[in-house]
Amino acid sequence: MRVLIAVLATALAGLVIAAPGASAQTGLTGVEASSTGLISDEGFVSLGTTLECAVPTSGATLSATLEQENSGGTSSAFGFGGHDVLDSFCEPGGSPMAIAFGSPEPPFTRGPAVVSMEGCAGGECMTGEETVQLRDGGRTVHASVPADAQSLLELGVSSRAVLETSGVVTLGTVIDCASVSGPAFSGTLEQRQGKRLSEATVSAFILGGCGGLHPEALSFTPVAGSPAFEPRKARLSLTACAGPAGADECAVVEARLKLIDAD
């Protein structure tokens, strides 16, 4: 089963600095980060970001470093966005790009941290530095994976997700797989609003192959015409697949998540 694409994330406000010679007429015009990141059980951090371009532009990338001074010393980790097949598209009004950071030593803790970003699109780059609040992502909910699995070895999602001011929902996942391609994700997030249903979807295919246990951050984009999500429980169904072409192994996580407002 081959699932395709578009990891989307979110976000919102901060200091943006144009690289020397960058034009406001074409290419990249903004780099922003969400105000809130979530720490998973495993110590990974998921964070929503947004890239904005004056005209639709493909090949967008974002590299970021998250750093925090805490009681254990200095925690620092690197994250990269733009390795999803469709996630590298940047357009006017902003395109979400979720970023996941690994677990450093000492680990990240709840509280403020600084994210330094460099976004590039259309041959132009911009940098930004913002203070974000790291919060508890809740327990990890795991999928049931067969004991004899060869490609997809583990899949889990944090029980909390960030409801961004844009309406996008940023969710942290953990995955362990042995595959030369993928992993691929597809899923829906639903919340009952009286007689109406709020719905958001994600479809993502990550380039570069899949190794040991690591984080992947996903952005669920609201379906057109769907009522806005509220900061309360929502139901998730997420499928992940990995493996050689035509022989994917897949796992499904069904969970109730708590949506929390970005600070």
Give the positions of each predicted feature.
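Short proline/glycine- and polar residue-rich coil/turn motifs
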Residues: 84-95, 205-215
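Hydrophobic beta-strand positions in extracellular immunoglobulin-like domains
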Residues: 50-53, 66, 101-103, 119-121, ...
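Short glycine/proline/serine/threonine-rich loop/turn segments at secondary-structure transition edges
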Residues: 103-114, 224-235
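Short, surface-exposed binding/anchoring microloops in extracellular/periplasmic proteins
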Residues: 28-71, 148-194
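Short beta-strand elements
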Residues: 124-147, 246-263
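Secretory targeting and sorting signals
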Residues: 1-24
